[in-house]
Every structure is written in structure tokens, then in C-alpha cells.
Design a protein with these regions (language model features):
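Acidic, polar-rich low-complexity tracts and alpha-helical solenoid repeat scaffolds
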Residues: 1-305
């Protein structure tokens, strides 16, 4: 009761000392196991996980098959999850013959641990758990989700070396909740790397499957530019016209589409069509694109003479 009173006032140190006295003075009483349990809980609530584990494991070892033992096991599981050491929990259970945890259950607990860290935006711990999961559960039930969490964590950390393998796993599965995000990420990466053939392929696939209007517009625009820079002018013209056929587009998207049309026709040698779109750009934009379009219009007129 003294220990409980200390806990009520958030004096965990005094509470632990009081519970320890009960354990030492009355080791065979029911109060002892309850007190030892409360010591473990006090350490756990105070974020002293190593001391909590020590006391909770003593509860399990000294008072098996009791309510306190079962409660202690649950908290031990939580601590190992908080530490991102879920395999150590499985090893502890197996070593002490406390239960038989099926592979499916281990798979599920490992995934939930990863999911918890990802929800907290703790990308380093998410990656640690994801790598362990992918190494152990090569046919796991949550492979798609784990690859996605690894992908997003690497993106959040700004690391690109490992990210592609996770993206490719996601996009090589049947279309799923993560496909849009993965395709958009890999398309942007390849576009920035000037790998326009690849970025065009990914943008085209994304435009075909996405149900999000903003993503669809970005995909068509990315495809348009990728095809243009890959010298595929008929495709860039096709994509530019797709953008202009959409009612709700921004002024910048309208300028970009007309500019790509003008440049594509110019590079094809169709100066009459090119002039038409350069003139549109001159009217729409008063900055660099407008100025360049004005100069290019003069070149078109010269070439048409």
C-alpha cells in the first residue's frame, strides 16, 4: 500500500524501494509477486527498459502460470518491440520454453513493430526492422508493405542507393495501394537522372492507372517532357495535346504544353505548326519562355521564307 501511494504521487523511486522491501521481506507471499510486477511496471513507465526487463523476467521465472506472469510477458513483448529487437523476444520465449510462437505469429509481430516505427516517422528504426524482416521472411505475408515502408523511409532519409530495389518490388506486383507512389518516385528519379526513356515508361504507366487528378497531370507532363528530351517528338506532341484537352490545368501547365508542342514541331522541321505554338507561348508568358518563344518565332518565319 505504501508503494501504491508513492505511485499515486508519481514518486516512482520511493515506490520501487517500497516494493523491493516487500519482495525481500515476504518472498513467498502473493504480495511479493505483485510487488515485483509493480517494480517492473514502474521502471517501464519511467523508460528504464533494461531494469524493467530484468524485473519482469524475474516475475515470469519465479511465478510461472500466474496472472502477473502473463502480464509480464505482454510487457516484455512491448519492450522488445520498442527497442526494435523483436527477434530477441522470440529467442527469449524459445530459450525458456514459455510458449510456441508460430512463424505466422512471428511474421505478424515483426511487421507490427516495423509499422509502429514507420507511423512515428522513425525511418532509421523502420529500415532496421525492414531489413531484418526481409532477411528472415523471404515469403512473408507482409512483403509488399515492408518494401513500401523501406522505400518511404529511404526517401525520407534522402538515401538513393538502396531505394530502387524496394520501388521495383512494389511496381512489379499487381497494381496495389502503393503503386502510384512508387511509380511517381521512380519516374521522378529517372527524369532527374536524365534517363528519359525509363522515366517516360514509368510516367506513361502511372498516367494510365492513377485515379488522382493531380498525379495524372504530373504523370502526363512528365511523360511529355521525357519523350521530348528522348527525341520522340510524335509522343511528346501527343502528350502535350492530352494536357491541353484537360479543362482544369494551371497556367504553367498550359505554357509548358504549348512550349513542348512548339519545340517538338520545330525539331521535326514543321515550322508552320511550330510558329503557331511559339506565338501562343509569347502571349501566355512574359518571362524566359516567352522571350525565347519570341526569338524562335522569328527563326520559324525566316525558315518559312
Amino acid at each position: 500500500e505504501i508503494g501504491i501511494a508513492y505511485l499515486a504521487t508519481n514518486d516512482s523511486r520511493s515506490a520501487i524501494a517500497a516494493f523491493d522491501r516487500v519482495v525481500k521481506e515476504k518472498p513467498r507471499s502473493s504480495y511479493a509477486r505483485k510487488s515485483l510486477m509493480k517494480v517492473g511496471m514502474a521502471y517501464y513507465n519511467n523508460d528504464e527498459n533494461d531494469k524493467a526487463l530484468e524485473n519482469l523476467k524475474n516475475v515470469v521465472a519465479q511465478y510461472p502460470n500466474t496472472e502477473e506472469s502473463r502480464e509480464a510477458l505482454n510487457i516484455i513483448s512491448n519492450i522488445y518491440r520498442d527497442k526494435n529487437e523483436i527477434q530477441s523476444y522470440f529467442d527469449y520465449i524459445e530459450k525458456n520454453n514459455l510458449a510456441v510462437i508460430s512463424i505466422d505469429k512471428q511474421d505478424s509481430l515483426s511487421f507490427v513493430t516495423i509499422q509502429d516505427f514507420y507511423s512515428k516517422r522513425d525511418y532509421n528504426e523502420t529500415l532496421k526492422g525492414a531489413r531484418q524482416y526481409l532477411d528472415k521472411y523471404q515469403n512473408g505475408a507482409y512483403l509488399l508493405d515492408v518494401h513500401y515502408y523501406a522505400m518511404k523511409s529511404l526517401e525520407g532519409l534522402g538515401e538513393t542507393e538502396e531505394i530502387r530495389q524496394h520501388i521495383e518490388y512494389v511496381i512489379n506486383q499487381p497494381d496495389n495501394d502503393y503503386t502510384d507512389n512508387a511509380l511517381l518516385l521512380i519516374a521522378r528519379m529517372d527524369y532527374d537522372a536524365e534517363n528519359y526513356s525509363s522515366s517516360a515508361e514509368y510516367y506513361d504507366r502511372l498516367a494510365d492507372i492513377t485515379e488522382n487528378q493531380d498525379i495524372m497531370l504530373e504523370a502526363i507532363e512528365g511523360s511529355m517532357k521525357s519523350h521530348y528530351f528522348n527525341n520522340e517528338y510524335n509522343k511528346s506532341i501527343e502528350k502535350a495535346n492530352e494536357i491541353l484537352a484537360i479543362n482544369e490545368i494551371s497556367d504553367n501547365q498550359k505554357i509548358q504544353a504549348n512550349y513542348i508542342l512548339a519545340k517538338s514541331y520545330f525539331d521535326k522541321g514543321d515550322y508552320e505548326e511550330s510558329l503557331k505554338y511559339f506565338n501562343i507561348c509569347t502571349g501566355l508568358d512574359k518571362t524566359e519562355i516567352g522571350a525565347e518563344s519570341g526569338y524562335s518565332s522569328a527563326v520559324c518565319i525566316y525558315n518559312l521564307q
